Every structure is written in C-alpha cells, then in structure tokens.
Amino acid sequence: MSTISIHRTETLRITHARSRIFRQRYRRTIPLWKLTINSRSSDTSKKEELSVQISIPPQVDQSRPEGLRFDRLQPPEPEFGHEDRFEFGKFVAREAMLDEEYWTAAWLRAESHWEDRSNERYVDNYKRKFAEQEFNAIKRRCKGMQGQKCSCIVAVKKEEKHIKRSVIKSVVGTLDLSIRYFLQGETFPGEKVKSQLFCSINQEGSNRYGYIANLCVAKSARRQGIACNMLRFAVESARLSGVEQVYVHVHKNNSVAQELYQKTGFKIVETGKFESLDDDTYLLQYTS
C-alpha cells in the first residue's frame, strides 16, 4: 500500500493595522487530504508516505504591544518640558518621549525600508514585523550602553488651535543620534584597525563623536525641509553634548541622500590610505 499525504502549513507573521497588531501562528501542520494507493506483489506489501508542504495565507490573531495607545492624543509641547527643541515652519524637531512616538518612528522606518518593494508578496506583513523589531530596538538603544548615548529624534506637527491629532498622525520624520567613543586605534567610524585580542574603548572626552542614522520622512510630508532641519537639530544637539565631530554613512548609489547631506553641511571623508569596513557606502562628516 502506498500512502500520499498532503499537508498545509501556517506561517507566523506579526502585522499592524492602525490601532491593532495581528499575530499569526505558524509551524502547525494540518492534514489537508490523503490519497491511498494499494499495491501488492506476491505475499508482500509496501507502504510509502509522501508529505508535501503548501504555504497558505496566514490566519489572524488580534493583539497589540503592551501599553501602546494608538488613539492617544498628542500632548501640548509645554507638557514635555523640552528646552532642546527646534521649531521650523509648521513643525518641531525634538527628542521622542512617548512610546507611541517611538512606534511611529519605527513604522516610518519600515515604510522607508520597503518603499521600493511594494509589489512583493506579503510586503505589508514584512513591514509590520520590521516595525515591531525596530520599536524594540529603539527603546533598547535609547537606554544606552557602555557609556554611549542614543536619542530618537522626531519631527512633529505644531499644535493648531481647535485641532486635535493623535500621536501617530503628528510624527512626520525621524532619525537616531548616537554619541559614541572611537575604538582604540580608530580615527573615523568604521575604520579597519589592526586586530587585537581585546578591543578597548577610549572613553576620553576628545574621543567622542556623533553618529546619525535611520533618517526618514513620511512620504506625505516630504519637500518641506523636514530632513534638513532634523539634521541641523541633531548636529546642534551633539555639540551641546560636547561633541564636535558628527558623521553619517550614505550608500554610494543614493545620490538623493548624498545631495541632502551635502546641502546640510556634510562632506565626504577622504579616507585615502585608510581601509573602511564597508565599500558600498561613503562616510560623511559635518564641516560647517
């Protein structure tokens, strides 16, 4: 007797749809149907089984990250007690304070990451999973480690009389600013240094530098100077922390980003004889 079993599998995706997070279970194999073929030869019988895995769209289980309120209204700016903030046009750049702001920053990064791949299958699920992972990573980075400091900077819409907005509709841009220490032997971030048994960090004040990453702006809010002004605020924040050198990496094929950074005062670092860890990017330093 030959037996053929065909099973279906479910996959795990974590998705976000406005005010809901959806979790989908996977790796549970359910028999779909079975075909049995009898085959006899003399007094012997043989039995074989073949399992075929078929991917199907995931089922939905509703839940949300603990403590997040996606309908939470944006509090008035004075309630944050922020002295370090930068107003420009209809927006304000400052450090994120609320979990809902961290989440929206993570979602903007997910949108940016998958922007050129919108036709891929299950792209919305991938974006939502990316956003959840980035949300947790932002909170972890902002707690600091080894004396290093990281801030999630956001651009939010200014308050308007008689208009109430939720937090997730107020945040229109984001970036990360890290205050780091050069590794022993480094003269710029990402430089290849001679391999050592133990890698040490020189925590002298003069060996600190600022590093900007994860800059993105909501598609609906672009071409309003948000990216440039967030960069200016980040540079000024680094200087207020006693850091003069501020760096950013940009992909060599991303001419739009290169133009943005150079317009804001960044210039490509001529590493020359030095080796960089990443040959696909340029290192830029703020010089103005």
From Swiss-Prot:
What EC number is given for this enzyme?
2.3.1.255, 2.3.1.48
**Which protein, by its recorded name, is this?**
GCN5-related N-acetyltransferase 6, chloroplastic
List of catalytic residues = 261 (proton donor)
Q: What family does this chain come from, according to its entry?
A: Belongs to the acetyltransferase family. GNAT subfamily.
Purpose: Protein acetyltransferase with dual specificity triggering both N-alpha-acetylation (NTA), with a large spectrum of modified N-termini, including methionine, alanine, serine, threonine and to a lower extent valine as substrates, and epsilon-lysine acetylation (KA).
| Tissues in which the protein is found | Expressed in green tissues and in roots.
Recorded superkingdom = Eukaryota
